[in-house]
Design a protein with these regions (language model features):
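Contiguous, structured surface segment used for ligand recognition
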Residues: 1-102
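Aromatic-lined carbohydrate-binding surfaces of glycoside hydrolases
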Residues: 7-16, 104-212
């Protein structure tokens, strides 16, 4: 089997297959984070059979591909938890067509809290020694895990030691490349990092009543 994957309206292959009635994407087109997986005979010249993964948007496409990854034995935690990946000589497909549902919760994710005590130190000392900080290489692994868990939302580390997320430009690019929506938590009202960006000696107390 070949695997053909792409997003409706963004992938030439997927749009061609739909225009030739090889696949019917009407059920998911325009939806939020949906995907379809279908076994297609003779999808394009030279390929007798293919598994086609079509997503309604970027995350839908990713979820479809990663659902196949999970089905063949790759745990979403393969990297973070050293979950072993069982090697298989052959993988079989049991269904001809599958269409996912729209997630019942629109935004699903995590907040990296109190990273000073663990994740920041590990990243600085082991994974991003050259940067000496919690940066894009670490965020790439976090974002990959989120996609593999079919999540889409991340409130980043924000302590003074690990810096505000946007202070390292590559962080934003990494999050966007994984189609992860970035949010903010208690230390970042209005996307301003009070833990590291508010300078009391120059800006005064963080107190609206007395320091407007």
């Amino acid at each position: 089997y070949a695997i053909i994957a792409g997003t409706i309206g963004e992938s030439g292959w997927i749009d061609v297959l739909a225009s030739r009635n090889k696949i019917d994407t009407a059920a998911i087109a325009g939806s939020w984070e949906r995907y379809m997986i279908e076994v297609v005979n003779n999808p394009i010249p030279g390929i007798k059979k293919a598994i086609v993964v079509a997503g309604s948007d970027r995350r839908g496409t990713a979820y479809g591909l990663l659902s196949i990854s999970k089905a063949i034995g790759v745990s979403p935690w393969y990297w973070w938890a050293d979950a072993p990946i069982k090697q298989q000589k052959q993988v079989s497909v049991k269904v001809d067509k599958f269409i996912s549902k729209t997630p019942s919760v629109k935004f699903r994710g995590i907040f990296i809290n109190d990273e000073d005590w663990g994740l920041y130190r590990w990243s600085k000392r082991n994974f991003e020694k050259e940067r000496g900080n919690f940066g894009p290489r670490t965020y790439a692994k976090v974002c990959e895990l989120l996609l593999r868990l079919q999540a889409n939302y991340l409130c980043p580390a924000m302590h003074d030691a690990s810096m505000a997320f946007h202070r390292i430009p590559e962080n934003r690019l990494v999050a966007d490349s994984f189609a992860i929506v970035m949010g903010s938590s208690h230390c970042e009202p209005l996307l301003f990092n009070t833990a590291s960006e508010w300078k009391r000696d120059k800006m005064g107390e963080w107190d609206y009543i007395n320091n407007k």
